[in-house]
């Protein structure tokens, strides 16, 4: 009797550059990517979301309307993937939808996280059971609600005799540390593409620095770099998580202190900042004869960033997750398909040693299709 099941993972990250969808086959715990798609996010929707995420004035009406629009956008993305793959909705066990994070505050007296994208709309329009709201159960148990992907990394990358670190460079950079003899660790190291993208968009009207062309025109400004490295978040102990609430243009403007830096030098310095904040954390976990760093996410396509990581981590084998047979572009979407699979089978999917939660739990809330 076949145990193969199909799930769809839907991810819209902090970069807000579109919706990633992954059609994933599970055979027990074996994972295979069947099909994938990128679905564009309308420019006006992205701008509204960015304004909300960066603390500009909003109201409940706008939040409610964004929740509704995103629900339809995610449903459209799923139906587009099914059409491309030639798969009927009836063949899908469930959708795992992350939603669009607009605020994440894991610390303080009233910890909370907010993801938009009405899963009721997704379930009813696609006619597929939908699992969403993955982070708040972990937070209710005292955890950070993030990162959630290390549990998936643990399931797909076999342990070696040396440390394997899986690095996802999205808007924020986060690592999963797979040590041969210790529990899995995972946390956000700091900014990934977020600051580079924001600065590039401000000064070149491009959403991101393609092939690092803008950064390669500049030089690292050591004084600015040292100022950026003073950020207190970098010196906090794990478990920890961060986002656009901290690392945004307002934060960067304050660090610039009105100095008249060349824009290309700032871009180059931001790239160096991302590389250094990552490599410093990765190097802490070097163990064994052949430690490896596996990179995924949009930052893996930044040649300057990858070059600097290789240079700063000379004792590590640095490659992309694609070299290990797991798509780097769709890693997070695959992870949320996996989280939905775990939910539907009532299996735990958080790692308390990673998030700080008091116990294991099956994450997510089911929104039935009927």
From Swiss-Prot:
Biological role: Catalyzes the specific phosphorylation of 1,6-anhydro-N-acetylmuramic acid (anhMurNAc) with the simultaneous cleavage of the 1,6-anhydro ring, generating MurNAc-6-P. Is required for the utilization of anhMurNAc either imported from the medium or derived from its own cell wall murein, and thus plays a role in cell wall recycling.
Lineage of origin: Bacteria, Pseudomonadati, Pseudomonadota, Gammaproteobacteria, Vibrionales
Reaction catalysis annotation: 1,6-anhydro-N-acetyl-beta-muramate + ATP + H2O = N-acetyl-D-muramate 6-phosphate + ADP + H(+)
Keyword Translocase: no
Binding residues for ATP: 13-20
GO biological process: 1,6-anhydro-N-acetyl-beta-muramic acid catabolic process; amino sugar metabolic process; peptidoglycan turnover
Entry superkingdom: Bacteria
Pathway: Amino-sugar metabolism; 1,6-anhydro-N-acetylmuramate degradation; Cell wall biogenesis; peptidoglycan recycling
One of the record's GO molecular function terms: kinase activity
Pfam family, one: AnmK
EC number in record: 2.7.1.170
Keywords noted in UniProt: ATP-binding, Carbohydrate metabolism, Kinase, Nucleotide-binding, Transferase
Entry-linked InterPro entries: Anhydro_N_Ac-Mur_kinase, ATPase_NBD
SUPFAM superfamilies: Actin-like ATPase domain (SSF53067)
Annotated family: Belongs to the anhydro-N-acetylmuramic acid kinase family.
Matches recorded under HAMAP family: AnhMurNAc_kinase
Protein name: Anhydro-N-acetylmuramic acid kinase
Keyword Transmembrane set for record: no
Spans traversing the lipid bilayer: none
């Amino acid at each position: 009797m076949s145990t193969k099941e199909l799930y769809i993972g839907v991810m819209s990250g902090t970069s807000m550059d579109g919706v990633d969808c992954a059609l994933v086959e599970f055979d027990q715990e074996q994972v295979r990517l069947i099909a994938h798609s990128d679905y564009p996010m309308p420019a006006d929707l992205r701008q509204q979301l960015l304004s909300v995420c960066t603390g500009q004035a909003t109201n409940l009406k706008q939040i409610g309307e964004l929740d509704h629009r995103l629900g339809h956008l995610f449903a459209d993305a799923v139906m587009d993937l099914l059409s491309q793959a030639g798969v009927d909705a009836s063949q899908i066990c469930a959708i795992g939808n992350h939603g669009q994070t607009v605020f994440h505050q894991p610390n303080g007296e009233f910890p909370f996280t907010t993801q938009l994208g009405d899963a009721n709309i997704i379930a009813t329009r696609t006619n597929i059971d939908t699992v969403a709201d993955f982070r708040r159960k972990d937070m209710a148990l005292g955890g950070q609600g993030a990162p959630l992907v290390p549990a998936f990394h643990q399931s797909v990358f076999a342990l070696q005799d040396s440390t394997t670190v899986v690095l996802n460079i999205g808007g924020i950079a986060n690592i999963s540390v797979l040590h041969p003899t210790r529990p899995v660790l995972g946390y956000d190291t700091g900014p990934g593409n977020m600051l580079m993208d924001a600065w590039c968009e401000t000064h070149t009207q491009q959403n991101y620095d393609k092939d690092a062309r803008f950064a390669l025109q500049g030089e690292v400004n050591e004084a600015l770099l040292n100022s950026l490295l003073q950020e207190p978040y970098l010196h906090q102990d794990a478990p920890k998580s961060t986002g656009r609430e901290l690392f945004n243009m307002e934060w960067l403007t304050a660090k610039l202190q009105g100095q008249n830096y060349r824009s290309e030098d700032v871009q180059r310095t931001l790239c160096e900042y991302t590389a250094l904040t990552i490599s410093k954390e990765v190097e802490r976990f070097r163990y064994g004869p052949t430690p490896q760093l596996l990179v995924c996410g949009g930052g893996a396509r930044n040649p300057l960033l990858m070059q600097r990581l290789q240079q700063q981590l000379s004792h590590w084998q640095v490659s992309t997750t694609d070299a290990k047979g797991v798509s780097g572009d769709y890693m997070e979407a695959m992870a949320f398909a996996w989280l939905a699979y775990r939910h539907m089978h009532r299996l735990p999917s958080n790692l308390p040693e990673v998030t700080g939660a008091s116990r294991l739990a099956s994450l997510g809330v089911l929104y039935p299709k009927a």
